Amino acid sequence: MTIPNDIRITPELVAAHGLKPDEYQRILDLIGREPTFTELGIFSAMWNEHCSYKSSKRWLRTLPTSGPQVIQGPGENAGVVDIGDGQCVVFKMESHNHPSYIEPYQGAATGVGGILRDVFTMGARPIAAMNALRFGAPDHPKTQHLVAGVVAGIGGYGNSFGVPTVGGEVNFDPRYNGNCLVNAFAAGLARTDGIFYSKAEGVGLPVVYLGAKTGRDGVGGATMASAEFDETIEEKRPTVQVGDPFTEKCLLEACLELMATGAVIAIQDMGAAGLTCSAVEMGAKGDLGIELDLDKVPVREERMSAYEMMLSESQERMLMVLRPEKEPEAEEIFRKWGLDFAIVGRTTDDLRFRILHGGEEVANLPIKELGDEAPEYDRPWAEPKMPPALDAATVPAADVADSLLKLLGSPDLSSRRWVWEQYDTLIQGNSLQIPGGDAGVVRVEDHPTKALAFSSDVTPRYCEADSFEGGKQAVAECWRNLTATGADPLAVTDNLNFGNPERPEIMGQFVRAIKGIGEACRALSFPIVSGNVSLYNETLGQAIPPTPTIAGVGLIPDWSKMARIAFAGEGQAILLAGAPESWGTHLGQSAYLRDVHGRAEGAPPPVDLAHEKRVGDFVRGVIRSGTVTAAHDCSDGGLAVALAEMAMASGIGARIDAPVNSASAAFFGEDQGRYVLTAALAREDAQLATLIEDARKAGVSLIAIGVTGGRELKLGEARAISVEELKEAHEGWFPRFMQDGSLQ
């Protein structure tokens, strides 16, 4: 059945499209009449949070987005950063949260597909992917189903397309029970003189539809992604898109081949709001109008209405403005790859967005007001109440060895091998470090020494306690993970996941997180070049923890000198960089406090950004000089977990000195800005004393805390734990949980 265009517009219909009464009045004032049903759908799609960023734009403008290496910042399909030698890295992270909760396999799969298109739309060949996943409590009846579906969807699409998944995160928390998070990242390589943009230029030029046919899948997807969930959630399943990675692979090859011919003036992938958003963005950015004839759009279903065709989010589709003389060559390329090619419209000089269907005009709207001049809100926000700092002395001592084993086998700190073994981590043949290290590392093809490092980070429990410090910490940990490989951190993309911005306390979390992120990015010269905001992550009024995911990219000039987390040999000195004399002090909001003592209290660890920069620059220097044989940052679980991960990665044990003060704080405190390093030096070696003195001159604490060797990890006076016992604790939880739902 075809949906007519002359449906009466009622307040109920307006509300069903996610538009507030004042927004609908603004539409009436803008166009001077009642909109058609298709026009209502177009406004609904373009003015929702997912497309317009109407609640967040005011604060996103405060973020640092430029730097000497930045070629393209926010506002395009992806960010672009120069890596020298005429090459650049193109990358972005984006959410597919709501679709993945409704239909986990397709929701996650199309999230991967969408972010890959964002990258190759810019003219880059994708070389790496990551994903940051948050699920509800392991004992929630839906969690196991969601984990299985999401991981299968990511693997199914990414593996088939042919991009290696080199990193990511998985967290569990009851606050995600009704709203999981799926944040997908992709990066690609391009030539700096071969970047393509979405800004249309020139009047009367053909607008060309490319790729797969249009169906009814995903109609209303962008609007669904801008709303809270309620008890009608299952009814939203038809709004989830269906992906085909093999078609996407053909689309990639066809686009890159066409780009090489010089035919492309502007290009935009059809993501959220499909044909509507892609056409509006191309025209609005270029100060041009766009006229589309829907009778020429390739469709795979009969009797599709204009409303459905304009709002369909069928996957693997592109919109381009082409040079007219190149049309035959362009069509030949796309036909060769088995893809549709259709001239569906033209650019105009009247700044109107005109839609024709069945010989009739079904929409005629001002294009700028739909696009870059959409509504913008300065929503009220409240300063959240900050928890007091936790006195570590109030935390009773627990057995260090038992505590370490419990942490290694906990849902949040256990091995993610079950997850990443379902992803192809080695395809393309350039992966130098796969998941399990501080950052994924991929060799830059056609260059003898360069590699790129990738990391994704945020600690939601820190953000819940103090989103300002949590925002700073997410940036700092990402910067630290890149540094720990020896990479120069270049730039980041963010994925800001929050609840309902109409609630001042939620908006307060968002604002403070933005302020923290901005402060950290400025201090660390780590600009934000792309990103995504996902709001209304709530179910029945229950918001997720604030989760501002930060994904960063770093450049390793010579990958033969990169550092890994595995102990490199026996008898090597173990050093702790950037730590206080007592090694660790901060137990507030720590994994140890939560998982061993069952307490979620205190302020998160503060981030001293000047200290972070000093320590990181020193660590990067000693990695590149060859002095350091292994490096690992200290994060969740503190020093003890970092040491255990280094031992498990190598099969080599270590003996660690007894700390001077509290063993709990020393081994499990989550003080920021710390790294564990090893050097092929004896404790009594004069070179080690020189290294420690060099650190002191650089304003960095460097403490010798132990030595590698044997097959056991002994932390101070605690009982020794064999590396095999560590691995058994670490590797067991996830497979048991996914096999039979075991929580032990």
UniProtKB/Swiss-Prot annotation:
Q: Where in the cell is it found?
A: Cytoplasm
Query: What are its E.C. numbers?
Result: 6.3.5.3
Give UniProt keywords alphabetically: ATP-binding, Cytoplasm, Ligase, Magnesium, Metal-binding, Nucleotide-binding, Purine biosynthesis
Q: Which reaction does it catalyse?
A: N(2)-formyl-N(1)-(5-phospho-beta-D-ribosyl)glycinamide + L-glutamine + ATP + H2O = 2-formamido-N(1)-(5-O-phospho-beta-D-ribosyl)acetamidine + L-glutamate + ADP + phosphate + H(+)
Q: Which residues bind Mg(2+) 2?
A: 118, 269
Q: Which InterPro entries match?
A: PRibForGlyAmidine_synth_PurL, PurL_linker, PurM-like_C_dom, PurM-like_C_sf, PurM-like_N, PurM-like_N_sf
Which EC class is this protein assigned? ligase
Listed PANTHER family = PHOSPHORIBOSYLFORMYLGLYCINAMIDINE SYNTHASE SUBUNIT PURL
Q: What does this protein do?
A: Part of the phosphoribosylformylglycinamidine synthase complex involved in the purines biosynthetic pathway. Catalyzes the ATP-dependent conversion of formylglycinamide ribonucleotide (FGAR) and glutamine to yield formylglycinamidine ribonucleotide (FGAM) and glutamate. The FGAM synthase complex is composed of three subunits. PurQ produces an ammonia molecule by converting glutamine to glutamate. PurL transfers the ammonia molecule to FGAR to form FGAM in an ATP-dependent manner.
The name of this protein is: Phosphoribosylformylglycinamidine synthase subunit PurL
Task: Say which species the protein is native to.
Answer: Chelativorans sp. (strain BNC1)
